[in-house]
Amino acid sequence: HIKYKAKQILTDKIDSELQRFNLSLNPFNPNSTIAKVNNNEDVEVDEWFTEVFNKAEEISQKSGGAFDITCAPLINLWGFGFSKMDSVTPQMIDSIKAFVGYQKVRLEGKKIIKEDPRILLNCSSIAKGYACDVIARLLEKEGVKNYMVEIGGEVTMKGVNQQGDCWRVGINKPEIGTSGVTNDVEEIVQLCQKGGVATSGDYRNFYIKDGKKYAHTINPATGYPAGQNILSATIVAEDCMTADAYATTFMVLGVEKAKLLAQSIPQIEYFIIYADNNGQQKVTYSKGMLEYLPNRKTLAILENP
């Protein structure tokens, strides 16, 4: 979904930009830069790959490795939707962890250097957000001042909508212990300046075994599904790539560690929906996030006149 106000229709330019993007960062396209890197082909990486790689490395360092684009082999081991849950052994995890870790891969000039040829990169937890930013840049280059770019639930926005109001996006209300997500809106996020909003939620994809919920987000440190208490994490940041990556990071860390990390990163605000020890749904959010929550902001003013 891309909404914008412009003198001419930009559909063709947007489509060709997305095709170029896929040729850089889509691991399922065998001709893409990332696929060639994963296949250990001799390839010079492009500017988009470089920007994503550098941002991923920065967030990996800040989060102590909770965010890690090298954990693709672990995701593959568990199988999509944990189809291989019962067959995964600690030995298998340890053997794969030998070639997982953001410190084991680096960018030198335009070349990716791997410590182990088995290292695979997967940027899915940052690339959708970056795609929003890429299209936003294109729109700005074309003189567009008001737009909203939404790709796979991640959003970059600037200016106002058709009615002249600030852009608004909804955060879905998760259902604990059911098939996942309702269409009910838990919260409205309103952005009146340029920025990115991303939500990561494991209620969409989890597996229950022996009474424990295993979330689809893998913890790179342990090699196991994160199993944290966060149902969904929404991040507001200056750009959507940053928001997207931190939303995933929060899912890995859990509520307390996520809040601690956020204190050291003033550029991001968060809204977390989590399950407490009794399985009750609760919310927590950063002080600065209140600015983007019109419904709660009004309540806060009424409660604290």
Predicted regions and their residues:
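Mature catalytic core of soluble alpha/beta enzymes
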Residues: 1-305
